[in-house]
Amino acid sequence: TSLDHAIDMIEDVMIHIEIYQPQHITPEINQFLDLVEKSAEELLTAVRLLKTYKKSQKEIHVVIDRINACEKEGDLLYIHSMRDLYQSNADAVSIVILGKIYKSLEDCCDAFKDVTKFVEEIALKYA
């Protein structure tokens, strides 16, 4: 399911950081991690609201919109992070390592957006 995929993407991020052992955690990595954390918290809120869907329809859609906004922010962050990385004086190995970590974090943000589609399907089923 899409939820399994999102969890797998979080695990991939941890694996990439473990394998590549970046010299330091960049501000961009921290920004991505903030987006992932916010998306996870919002997803938990959406799932809890499903219990009272008839009363919470509008609120669920607001929460889904916030998750989608995090995904869009993740896309922009990825573009800016990669641009800045390629324009930096970093060595080739650091560019490859950070690029892979940034991509796995951006994929993680995408996966949460995919889960919102699943939440919407559940909500429609029980509407």
Segments (PLM) and residue ranges:
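Cytosolic, long alpha-helical scaffolding segments
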Residues: 1-127
